[in-house]
From Swiss-Prot:
Name listed for the protein in its UniProt record: Phosphoenolpyruvate carboxylase
Stored SUPFAM superfamilies: Phosphoenolpyruvate/pyruvate domain
Cellular component aspect of the GO annotation: cytosol
Signal peptide residue numbers: none
GO biological process, one term: tricarboxylic acid cycle
Keyword Thylakoid: no
Organism: Rhodopseudomonas palustris (strain BisB18)
One example GO MF annotation: magnesium ion binding
PANTHER family with a match to the protein in the record: PHOSPHOENOLPYRUVATE CARBOXYLASE
EC number in record: 4.1.1.31
Catalytic residue positions: H162, K591
Keywords: Carbon dioxide fixation, Lyase, Magnesium
Length: 929
């Protein structure tokens, strides 16, 4: 806010840490940006809301600092008195002020990260393509070997609509405007007049942000979510995916002096519009709409690029030679303009544009720039790219390679990566829905049989027999239930999409809560019904099991072994290039067994799956269903990929990106490029370089098994075995209020109960983040370490310290926990505990949580041999510490509003205040879901 409120240096409120001068200089520039934005926001608040609101914000902030730093009881009483004295409208104004400061501080921090990326650009470092290629060279891997690796590689970020981004798109658009202005300030040398004009622009942007609704008034539809997801293609993917390929291609060609094109390996995926698991609003019609929106975005981008390319390629025939193929392409163009008669490249581009426009019309897209004349539509993206290749070869052959390496190169690569469909849309549904659908189909087709009553082996035998049968299972003369008709309609829509866009438009059919071989065969049979699996044993779609619970992870290798032993299924895998994808669920396994056990069972499942797939001679591709928060598998992607067991990556990886994580990673082109580079570099390193390192020692695995067992017992003991825990959870968190936020199209619970088992993982994790406990990201660790050291009194702690130093998996596990605990606050959490009306229950459960929190922090510090949390990550430590003075007040206000909301009749203004605090706290935490 103004110089009176916001510019205080929160870093100075803690004991200073000795750091290198470069880091201090980084901090100074970051603080300059925060001060500037804070001053502008403060002036805006004073102008718009008055001096009184302005002063109260400062009092709350200062008192909150005392409470957080010292757990000061007088500060707590003073804070409660200030908040009690506020009217609801003033409370809302104050919440908005603190929330927007968190948003603006995030922008400044992002800009600082971009500054660091630019400073390090081109230098070999972990997570960079340059660093990874240098590492590969150092261990004797040639450029040609790397080209062969990428020819069979797949790196696929998959965007999902999991509802963890609480900001409206309008808010994000305004914030991107502020970010763009900060970037301009960074890049340009301005005169005094330009500096003043620039600040005026910032003031306009911040004022507009202040006067923009922070909350959505209506619930998002699925197609709204699709449109939001597509905006990141404009910001990042459509340009940065081709650029990353170009960077790698150039580096490899520089290494060995060749001039070879690199195979495209980075492919985008999406769940938005195809994920039906628990979302009744994703129908066949919605899926059709999602595919249309995706394709429209891709074709419009290509048409715009062709229009620009036509302007650029003003090459005259009498000044430069052209190839025969190019001349033929120009002659076929419907462009009859005399102005371009001697410009063969422009004529060729006009013809290509006309054919692509005809393709768009064939796919029933409107609102495109009119072509110069009628033309034949392209049959597929390969035909379109073949014409672009003619331009490329002609330029190369006639000494114009520098032109070929510009916009044309980027466009050719984009077509190769995005096709006409933009991203492969995954279909996902719960295995229970497939089971009910198959039951209805089989019971109608085979009177007297009861599919639901059959055991697993009987089901496998029946489904395998049906797979070999040439007759369809569904009948047009049977009146099926609504659910079955809906599922059949979705599969038929998938078949139609394949006919319209090609086989890459929908490549995966994912089975949530997969518990057996029959769950897989049911989906194969549904694909066969619509022609996506044929009688010759060819499948147009990968059937992907999703193993989510601890029990299912433990059973996963056995299920896949049985499945790959079935001749009828193995034929389908062979038809897909001998690759079988398996998805692992981080969220539900965490909710089921806790952070430590979830991480360990996922690791063990991967080890066992690698063995099974090697035995069957099938290539394993793992799809990691990670969330944004550590409690849902989040954390740095580079570390997570390198921490995988040997053989688990093997050149292919898919990974979910969702909600606030999509925004933070891909709303800025440079940041997007960096994150794509990290995924590519980590996949290469984990596949080619890490296998050369030795596997973890047996005693490491034994120790982790013991830790997991102890942690599982502690976690389950609290969450599932403590009487009254569900009541405590629902009373001490904002779980009820989260459902009112309109942040996604999907319901928060699978069933209308208060059972933890029925709650989705996102609201579970989100709720614990809001009350600043982050319990899913650490609970059980302290008890596990205490029990382990007690069993190994002589060398237990020293051995765990060795594990941390030597084993990437354990190091990554603890590093993520370090970050989570640094964001937590037991003092603030104690205020949420007071919302529980039963004092005995409150003291019993919060007492256990508090003891485990202290024990987990101490265990973590002992193993990492640190004096404080995040000691080994000073940049993140500073970042989190900077946020507390503006984040903590939102928690205090939220508690007071929750008290009022739950003790009186529903007041929309109070509820709106709670929703605003949820928004602001999420912004301050950055990865809360």
């Amino acid at each position: 806010m103004s110089s009176k409120i916001m510019p205080i240096d929160p870093i100075a409120q803690k004991t200073p840490v000795a750091e290198d001068p470069a880091a201090i200089d980084e901090d100074a520039r970051l603080r300059d940006d925060i001060r500037l934005l804070g001053r502008i926001l403060g002036d805006t608040v004073r102008d718009q809301e008055g001096e009184g609101v302005f002063d109260v914000v400062e009092r709350i902030r200062q008192t909150s600092i005392r409470f957080h730093r010292d757990n000061d009881k007088p500060a707590r009483s003073e804070l409660e008195a200030i908040l009690d004295g506020l009217s609801t409208p003033d409370t809302v104004r104050i919440v908005r002020a603190f929330s927007y400061f968190s948003h603006l501080a995030n922008i400044a921090e992002d800009q600082n990260n971009i500054r660091q990326m630019r400073a390090l650009s081109g230098t070999p470092r972990p997570g960079s393509v340059v660093g990874t290629l240098a590492h590969a060279r150092a261990v004797g891997i040639s450029a040609q070997e790397l080209r062969r690796f990428f020819a069979h590689a797949l790196v696929s970020p998959v965007l999902t609509a999991h509802p963890t981004e609480v900001r409206r798109k309008s808010t994000m658009d305004r914030e991107m405007e502020v970010a763009g202005l900060l970037d301009r300030r960074e890049r340009l040398q301005m005169t005094a007049e330009e500096v003043a004009q620039h600040e005026e622009q910032l003031r306009r942007a911040v004022l507009t942000l202040w006067q923009t609704n922070m909350l959505r008034r209506t619930k998002l539809t699925v197609l709204d979510e699709v449109k939001n997801g597509l905006s990141f293609y404009d910001h990042s993917f459509l340009r940065e995916v081709p650029r990353l390929h170009g960077l790698l291609e150039d580096r490899l060609n520089d290494d060995d002096g060749r001039d070879e094109e690199l195979a495209s390996f980075l492919r985008m995926g999406s769940w938005i519009g195809g994920d039906r698991d628990g979302n009744p609003f994703v129908t066949a019609e919605v899926m059709r709409g999602a595919l249309r929106l995706q394709s429209t975005r891709a074709l419009r981008f290509y048409l715009d690029e062709l229009h620009a390319l036509g302007s650029e390629l003003s090459i005259a025939a009498h000044l430069a030679d052209v190839s025969d193929d190019l001349r033929l392409l120009a002659e076929r163009s419907p462009d009859t303009s005399p102005h371009r008669s001697g410009e063969p490249y422009r004529l060729a581009v006009s013809g290509i544009y006309a054919r692509l426009a005809a393709t768009a019309h064939k796919l029933k897209f409107d609102d495109i720039r009119a072509p110069v004349g009628a033309a034949e539509p392209y049959a597929d993206p390969q035909e379109f790219k073949a014409d672009l290749d003619v331009l490329h070869r002609s330029l190369i052959a006639n000494q114009a390679s520098v032109i070929a390496r510009g916009r044309l190169r980027q466009l050719r690569r984009a077509v190769d990566c995005f096709g006409f469909h933009l991203a492969s849309l995954d279909m996902r549904q719960n295995s229970a829905v497939h089971e009910r659908t198959m039951t209805e189909l089989i019971d109608a087709a085979m009177p007297g049989k009861s599919y639901m009553a059959m055991n697993e082996e009987a089901r496998i035998a029946l489904l395998a027999g049906e797979l070999r049968s040439t007759r369809p299972l569904a009948s047009p003369f049977v009146k099926y239930g609504e659910e079955t008709l809906g599922e059949l309609a979705v599969f038929r829509t998938a078949a139609e999409a394949h006919a319209a866009f090609g086989h890459t438009v929908i490549s995966q059919c994912i089975i949530s809560m997969c518990k057996g071989v029959s769950d897989m065969l049911e989906v194969v049979l549904l694909l066969k019904e619509v022609g996506l699996v044929d009688h010759a044993g060819r499948s147009a779609i990968n059937v992907v099991p999703l193993f989510e619970t601890i029990e299912d992870l433990q059973a996963s290798a056995g299920i896949m072994d049985r499945l790959l032993s079935l001749h009828d299924y193995r034929r389908l895998v062979d038809s897909r290039g001998g690759v079988q994808e398996v998805m692992l669920g981080y969220s539900d396994s965490n909710k089921d067994g806790g952070f430590v056990t979830s991480g360990w069972e996922l690791y063990k499942a991967e080890i066992e799956l690698v063995k099974v797939f090697e035995h069957h001679g099938v290539r394993l591709r793992l799809f990691h269903g990670r969330g944004g928060s550590v409690g849902r598998g989040g954390g740095p992607s580079y570390d997570a990929i390198l921490a995988q067991p040997g053989g688990a990556v093997n050149g292919q990886i898919r990974i979910t990106e969702q909600g606030e994580i999509i925004t933070s990673k891909y709303s800025n082109a440079e940041v997007g490029r960096n994150n794509l580079e990290i995924l590519a570099a980590a996949t290469l390193e984990a596949s080619l370089l890490m296998p050369r390192q030795s596997a973890p020692r047996a005693e490491y695995l034994d120790a982790m098994e013991q830790l997991s067992s102890f942690a599982f017992k502690a976690y389950r003991g609290l969450v599932y075995e403590t009487e009254g825990f569900e009541d405590y959870f629902w009373a001490s968190t904002v779980i009820t209020e989260i459902a009112t936020l309109n942040i996604g199209s999907r319901p928060a619970s699978r069933k209308k109960t208060h059972k933890i088992e029925d709650l989705r993982a996102i609201p579970w994790v989100f709720s614990w983040a809001q009350c600043r406990l982050m319990l899913p990201g650490w609970y059980g660790f302290g008890s596990a370490v205490e029990a382990f050291v007690k069993e190994h009194p002589d060398k237990g702690m020293a051995f765990l310290q060795e594990l941390y130093r030597e084993w990437p998996f354990f190091r990554t596990l603890l590093s993520n926990m370090d970050m989570v605990l640094a964001k937590s606050s037991i003092a603030i959490a104690s205020r949420y505990a007071e919302l529980v009306p039963d004092e005995q229950l409150r003291q019993a459960i919060f007492g256990r949580i508090r003891a485990e929190w202290h024990g987990s922090i101490q265990a973590l510090l002992d193993i990492m041999q640190q004096d404080r949390l995040l000691q080994s990550n000073p940049r993140l430590e500073r970042s989190i510490r900077n946020r507390f003075p503006y984040l903590d007040p939102l928690n205090h206000v939220q508690v007071e509003l929750l008290k009022e909301h739950r003790s009186h009749a529903i007041d929309e203004k109070v509820l709106r205040g709670i929703q605003l605090t949820i928004n602001g706290i999420s912004a301050g935490l950055r990865n809360s879901g």
